[in-house]
Amino acid sequence: MAHARLFTDTRVINMITWSGTKKIKDIFEGYKNNSDTEEGGITSMNDKLNIRPRYQRLYIRENDKVWKDNLINSIICKFPINRVYFGVFEENGVESYELLDGQQRLITICEFLNGKESITINGDELAFAALPDDIKEDILNYEIDVTYCKGDEDARIKWFKRINQPNSILTEQEFLDRVPA
């Protein structure tokens, strides 16, 4: 485990971090996308992973077929994909997680497994259920690199801003829209 020290406004934010892997099938377990309902949440790992914490932006890859196909094809080809970051906290004595980075990837993967997305392979549109069993198993057993970040909510939000800063994709307004003042 490493101790990360984030310097923000002359304050030090302490977090404990460690790395590991998670199989896609373990992340997908109990996946629920209620983003179109009043509940509005997206969870997996039997409600232990909040894929869209309040500070995350909305899913922006909905119409980006090439990006989604490339992601799933990378997994099928066993190419590495970018790591994801889980914020770790305790809720009612149970260790739970919220996704700090990797929302677009995890939603795309879970929606594909759920049958809501298909991919183009050799010109054919295929849903997960239509794939050969060995490819389905390879996808489900694919291991995603995870960095776990344990700290209070303020530290997790600061960490989220820090790891998303180099991408310059998340605008300050997008961040302000997601986090109440």
Language-model features: locations:
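N- or domain-start disorder-to-order transition segments that initiate the globular core
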Residues: 11, 15-50
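Basic- and aromatic-enriched surface patches that contact anionic nucleotides/nucleic acids
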Residues: 4-22, 29, 56-62, 69-181
